[in-house]
Amino acid sequence: MTITLRHATVDDLRAVGALHQRSRVAAYSSFLPAEALADPTEEAMGWYWVERWTWERDDHLMTVAERDGRLVGFSYVGPDDAGDPATGLLNAIHLEPAERGRGTGRALMDDALATMRDRGRTRAVLWVLAGNAPARRFYERGGWRPTGERREELIGTARTPQLRYAREV
């Protein structure tokens, strides 16, 4: 059972959104209250991705991972949110919860870095939730390091600190 990576199409986006919400609940429930993760629903997250894709598809790329023809993960890359043309932003890697530890996240990360390289980027950045220790370890094993920058994101009603990580591509 091998993983296949391909560029997402508009037909993938509702399923990507449902996967995204399942991944968020599984990954964040150890440090965020259930009410913060109750919304959006899987369906609403699907429509969020359909809408987001319409205004970001020209400068972002979503890659989906499939195992035996079934969607099991995705990555989303785009330009740096601070405006540095030499830097790419890894917006997201999300997996079906049962897919963790099977190499899919690493395959998506490697593909995202290759995409940035192909687009002329020399540096990559991402934001990771400070409380998400497994994700932080995953990125650190992949060569990412904290930059010292912090910000807060509102997830549901919970203010959630994020840390910026960077690495060369």
Language-model features: locations:
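Acetyl-CoA-dependent GNAT
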Residues: 3, 7-11, 21-99, 106-111, ...
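Alpha-helix N-cap/helix-start and coil->helix boundary motif
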Residues: 10-13, 132-133
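A short, ordered amphipathic alpha-helix with a cationic face
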Residues: 14-15, 139
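Hydrophobic pocket/interface hotspot
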Residues: 16, 20
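C-terminal "cap" of GNAT-fold acetyltransferases
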Residues: 87, 122-136, 141-169
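Short, charge-rich amphipathic segments
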Residues: 101-103, 125
